A protein has these predicted regions:
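Accessory, non-catalytic peripheral segments of nucleic-acid enzymes
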Residues: 225-357
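Alpha-helix termination/capping residues and helix-transition junctions
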Residues: 38, 147, 180, 262-264
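His/Asp/Glu-rich metal-coordinating catalytic cores
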Residues: 43, 50, 55-200
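A structural signal for the main folded, soluble domain(s) of proteins
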Residues: 1-2, 29, 35-37, 136, ...
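N-terminal active-site segment of His-dependent metallophosphoesterases
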Residues: 1-64, 141, 145-149, 342, ...
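Conserved beta-strand elements of the Class I
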Residues: 4, 126-128, 221, 268
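Short beta->alpha connector loops
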Residues: 131-137, 206, 249, 276
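A conserved active-site cap/scaffold subdomain adjacent to cofactor or substrate pockets
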Residues: 189-239, 243-246
Length: 357
């Protein structure tokens, strides 16, 4: 049996941004559900953080969630099992009040949500579904983890040693990987960066949400219960783009022939590496703005930038997060204190990046 795994969808992200809603809608309309139809996949497991806001959901986002995700599930006669993540819960110490219970707990759809650890069978294969672990369910969750006969675990977990973002710090909180060593396969949501360490797989979010996601591959996975393998299906759509401008290496013809349509409704950083001909730059910016990007930031940088390794270019020439981390590194405090300060800075920075102002 093949199961589509998706996680950290964060409907209503970027403060219920319509641009973000339109962007993620393309993923479901063009990539996710067409793939499921083509491969005749009739089971989805969502590994948590279906919605973004913990405290409330506005009417527009609720409708977008239904029209974009729930409705195609129902119309495609697909079964969906939704694991509750920390963004889905109203309180931090209990999962009892959560988005899926309040929105779809009384619906007639073939949709189930899991706010407690549960073992389900999929075509003869037992899988432990493990929602966000908090103080009220910790003991029960750990008991099931220790005693279950299931060899596969899907959850929304915070596990030490994994990175939430590609440019972030390794998590030092939460459970140790050894807690899950008895399972053959562990798949988790929560951290948006895809990574694997031994038997544990963080699946990552299906699309970009902040500048930290730039050039970090996004998509969803298909799990084969018979072979116990994961297949990654890439999402080609990007919300964040960078243009490195160097008119010593590009001509006016290059600028005029460039396809700017990919920048519509997106965030764009124009990094000026070398500017010798202002007219060429003006034409590039004119064409860029005509494509109706959502936001454009121009960074005047005179450092040597290796265009062959664009992923090494920071958010800015030296972005805010890098500057703050370097400052903390030079403070006369212990390494542990530096880690805690950097972790808090990372958290605040990514919260700010996810806001739509």
């Amino acid at each position: 049996m093949k199961i589509a795994l998706v996680t950290d969808t964060h409907f209503g992200g970027k403060s219920d941004s319509e641009v973000f809603a339109k962007y993620i809608g393309r993923f479901y309309r063009d990539i996710f559900f067409p793939y499921l139809k083509k491969e005749n996949i009739k089971q989805i497991i969502h590994l948590g953080d279906i919605v973004d806001r913990r405290k409330f959901i506005n009417f527009s986002t609720a409708r977008h969630l239904h029209e974009t995700f729930i409705k195609p599930i129902v119309e495609g006669q697909i079964r969906a099992d939704l694991i509750i993540g920390n963004h889905d819960t109203y309180y931090k110490n209990t999962n009892d009040i959560n988005s899926m219970r309040e929105l779809y707990g009384h619906s007639v759809y073939d949709i189930s949500y899991f706010d407690k650890a549960t073992v389900r069978e999929y075509d003869g294969t037992e899988i432990l579904l493990l929602p966000w672990i908090c103080s009220s369910n910790y003991d029960e969750s750990m008991k099931i983890v220790r005693e279950t006969s299931a060899q596969i675990c899907f959850g929304h977990l915070e596990i030490q040693g994994f990175m939430m973002y590609r440019d972030g710090l390794a998590c030092q909180n939460g459970l140790t990987p050894e807690v899950f060593s008895r399972f053959d396969v562990v798949c988790s949501g929560h951290f948006h960066h895809r990574s694997t360490m031994e038997n544990i797989n963080y699946l990552g979010s299906p699309y970009e949400m902040t500048w930290s996601d730039y050039n970090d591959s996004r998509g969803f996975h298909v799990f084969d219960t018979e072979k116990r393998t994961l297949t990654f299906v890439r999402n080609p759509y990007k919300l964040f783009h960078k243009i490195v401008y160097d008119d010593s290496k590009m001509s006016l013809k290059d600028v005029m022939s460039k396809d700017y349509s990919v920048y519509t409704d997106s965030y764009v950083k124009v990094i000026i590496s070398s500017k010798n001909n202002p007219y060429v730059l003006d034409k590039l910016l004119d064409n860029l703005y005509q494509s109706n990007p959502h936001n454009v930031a121009i960074v005047d940088d005179h450092k040597n930038i290796n265009e062959q390794s664009e992923e090494e270019i920071g958010v800015d020439a030296e972005d805010t997060l890098t500057v703050l981390r370097k400052y903390v590194s030079n403070i006369d405090i212990s390494d542990n204190e530096k880690y805690l300060v950097k972790a808090e800075i990372d958290n605040l920075y990514h919260q700010a990046q996810n806001m739509e102002i």
